[in-house]
Amino acid sequence: MKILAKWLALAVLLCTMPAKAALDIVITEGVDAARPIAVMPFQWQGAGAPPQAIADVVMSDLIRSGTFKPLDELGLPQRGIGALAQFDASAWANVGAEAVVVGSVKPYGTDQFLVSFDLIDLVKAQNQALKGPTSATEFLMDSRQTVISAAQFRQYGHRISDIVYEKLTGIRGAFLTRISYVVVNHTQKAAYSLMIADYDGYNEQMLLRSPEPLMSPSWSPDGRRLAYVSFENKKAEIFVQDLYTQVRTKVSSFPGINGAPTFSPDGKSLAVTLSKDGQPEIYVIDIATKAAKRITNHYSIDTEPSWYPDGKSLLFTSERGGRPQLYRVDLNSGKVTRETFEGEWNLGGSITPDGRSMIFVNRTNGKFNIARMDLSTRFMQVLTSTRLDESPSVAPNGTMVIYGTTYQGKQVLAAVSTDGRFKARLPVGQGEVKSPSWSPFL
């Protein structure tokens, strides 16, 4: 029970941070090694100023991806171009970037704007320029236009980023996703707030506020619901809340521990930790009927379940080997297999959406860091270098991990790419932030 007490204390501690309009993202490592790309300011074809600079959103997204490094606009060979027709391939011959994004915005009626953009392959354009005159469309990677309102500028900027990212990497972009997290501010009577925001911290919304701890938010596969643990009734209970209707459903309120909910891939069940029959064990609860099926049965602590992408197995943390390690249980046979062996502890694990890697918290020499293990080679890579990392959650495209850590004595969120190159911190002005969860594709 000593280990469980530590985990529960950590989880309660994890629930304490302040609400703010947006989380600030401070990039701490990895930009210099990223792939150069050019993003031109979108040409404004109206009076006054545009509602928002879409190119700024795109540049910020590409930087935060850890994959791309937008070049300084002042060093680009052309200015004020908004379409492929204005692009001069010969002028870009010595620009060390693989692509350029150009676009335009013009009024299109009352609170309506026509946004157009072109993604141009600079490598192909430079090669064609050496061969002589050719059709510019040969190096056009994508071209789109859409009518949006002023309120949609930021979201459409994320959409452009998704398109650019996928065209250049072959991986779906995750810039139109959201995150949930718990903010704790003990200067307020209701100190705990369950928040959701865009992946970059903008458009923050409060889902629930409570004087008692809130923890462990988890997204449904369709992005419509959140499961979480609340102590509002002076005991741990698991709720599922619809983000659109705000309807809350109490799913689990058994005696003892009700914790660590995570949705099944089909959204019909929750894997949870319950202690109603004695020791903390893994159960699967049918959300519609509330029926709980016991999955593990061991005298040691079993907790922190997460699903394999095929829905046929669960990954969980157990100290059945003497120390917390990650195990896999087959839901049909009940067979349990140990998955981790390196380091002192390994806990809080999840499988990446492609099923190829495991992301988890590794403790080695007393330091808690986020780590990744390749499931085919079993090679483990420690991704972070701080000391008190916890609660990793993987982006739906598998390229980034958001997690909780400590910075200057406060709980903050941080992000790291799954190759460990790119690192960023997401601090807030007051209070602390913890228990992050990254949404599916929306």
UniProtKB/Swiss-Prot annotation:
Residues 1-21 form the signal peptide. Pfam families: PD40, TolB_N. Gene3D superfamilies: TolB, C-terminal domain, TolB, N-terminal domain. Its main location: periplasm. Keywords: Cell cycle, Cell division, Periplasm, Signal. InterPro entries: 6-blade_b-propeller_TolB-like, PD40, Tol-Pal_TolB, TolB_N. One of its GO terms (biological process) is protein import. It comes from the Bacteria. SUPFAM superfamilies: TolB, N-terminal domain, Tricorn protease N-terminal domain. One of its GO terms (cellular component) is periplasmic space. It is found in: Periplasm. Belongs to the TolB family. The Tol-Pal system is composed of five core proteins: the inner membrane proteins TolA, TolQ and TolR, the periplasmic protein TolB and the outer membrane protein Pal. They form a network linking the inner and outer membranes and the peptidoglycan layer. HAMAP family: TolB. Part of the Tol-Pal system, which plays a role in outer membrane invagination during cell division and is important for maintaining outer membrane integrity. This is Tol-Pal system protein TolB. It comes from Shewanella sp. (strain ANA-3).
